[in-house]
Amino acid sequence: QRINSVYNPEDLIERKIAVEQGSGAASALMGYKGGLLRNQVSIFKDGIEAAKQVLTGAFDAAFVSRAQAEAAIFERKDNPTPWALSSLTLPGVMPNGWPLGLAVKADNKELATALDNALTTLRERGELLRLFKSHGLTLAAP
C-alpha cells in the first residue's frame, strides 16, 4: 500500500524505509524514540540509491534530502507516476536542510566578492534556476 504523505515518524511504523549510509538523518531516524523504527531501516550507499528503492517499489519510504529524491525521480523519465515528497522533522536533523556555501580564505576578499557577484548574476538571469530544473531539482532560497 502506497503512502500518500508522512507527517511524523509514527506514520512509518511497519513500513520499509531506505536511508543513506553515514547520514545524520539515518542516525536520527534509527535512534528516534529509542529505536522505534530501527528494524525497518535499510542502508544504501547514497541518498539517490535509497530514493530509487521507493521508485522501484522495493521500499515504502526513503528518508533523504529533497535534492536526492528529486534526482532519483528525474532519472526515471520513463515512469510518469507522480511521487509525493513530504518534509519530516526529527530531533537532530536540520528542518530546512543543511546550509551550503562557498568557502574562501578570509584574506581573499576579492575572490569572495567575485564569486558572490557571479552567483547573484546567475540567479538574476534565471540561469541558476534553469540549471536546477535541467537536473529535475527545486531551487530553494536559503
What are these regions (language model features)?
Residues 1-142:
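Proline/Glycine/Serine-rich low-complexity intrinsically disordered segments
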